[in-house]
Amino acid sequence: MLDLAYLQTAPEQTALLKQQATDFIVREELGYPLSGDGEFAAVKIRKTNANTIWAGEQLAKFCGISVRNMSYAGLKDRNAITDQWFSLHMPGKPTPDFSRFRIEGIEILEVTRHNRKIRTGSLQGNHFDILLRNADATEELNRRLNLVKRLGFPNYFTEQRFGRDGHNLTEAMRWAKGEIQVKDRKKRSFYLSAARGEVFNLVVSDRLQMGLATQVMPNDILQLAGSHSWFQANEKEDLNALQVRLEHHDILLTAPLIGDPPQSANALENQVVAQHQALLTLMKREHLKPARRPLLMRAQNLNWQFEPTGLRLQFFLPAGSYATALIRELVRVVD
């Protein structure tokens, strides 16, 4: 992350993040109603300084089912207070009495039934309430806040995607080069995600360095706002008209989540992607289809206020975007 470009320049001001669990609060928004009946117990919890997988294991143990029958929509930060849903596959079994559930760091908020598994990625997004300690109301920081509100921030994958000390990315590279075999299904998923995240970040950073993060280029692959539909800015498209649509947030620039067959986009992107042949071969071997991801992301309902202890941010991000990528554009987080 240190070498990736900024939409603006590197921030001047420093701040402290996650000094206390209350400094980083996340509320998950599934975006769909739960059915109230079905084979799955659906449990909404509030966890404090606990990781998602461990919390899910405790729920599965309480229900007397295998951890394989537990699922969730997304991994949440450990050093935080986070609200999220879990589904527990219990066909033909009654919902346990969760008022008897007693595990430090986990509070049961809501219990119901659902007719489907809550799958990874099956959420609308997350609400954030974050305190950046020691951040002062300088002219520079206010300017950054207003620019992030207007233009957005580079939609980078951050450290969570790559594992501790980049372990998942390191292993993905070794796997791609044939140095290791990976049989564990979860590890395969983590490593493939890290590999795609790395190439995406490099494409975005390269484009930012060229000053083209808000400019439609020939052969760009563009996303219709609010959808997962893409189209290409080929010779049939009017680039000036597309530029106007981009500025009105009707369409979004995208960067690749590599897969097979490879996508041909603008020349700048193609050049970066071509430097990662081993990863492209891995994607082909694993039958991973290509996808796109917005190059910039605008936080919804972004609000802020300066408090005696620092800067408080409140905003909503769609699933898959990282609050730490937004914060990176505002301040340098120090230990």
From Swiss-Prot:
Q: Which Pfam families match?
A: TruD
Q: Which reaction does it catalyse?
A: uridine(13) in tRNA = pseudouridine(13) in tRNA
What residue stretches are annotated with the TRUD domain? 152-308
Sorted alphabetically, which PROSITE patterns does this protein's record hold? TRUD (PS50984), UPF0024 (PS01268)
Q: Which GO terms describe its biological process?
A: tRNA pseudouridine synthesis
**UniProt keyword annotations, A-Z:** Isomerase, tRNA processing
Query: Where does the record place the catalytic residues?
Result: 77
Q: Give the Enzyme Commission number.
A: 5.4.99.27
* CDD domains in the cross-refs: PseudoU_synth_EcTruD
Cellular component terms per the entry's GO annotation: cytosol
Q: What class of enzyme is it?
A: isomerase
* GO MF, one annotated term: RNA binding
The function of this protein is: Responsible for synthesis of pseudouridine from uracil-13 in transfer RNAs.
**Hey, which family's this protein in?**
Belongs to the pseudouridine synthase TruD family.
Could you tell me which HAMAP family the record lists for this protein? TruD
What is the protein named? tRNA pseudouridine synthase D
| Protein source organism | Actinobacillus succinogenes (strain ATCC 55618 / DSM 22257 / CCUG 43843 / 130Z)
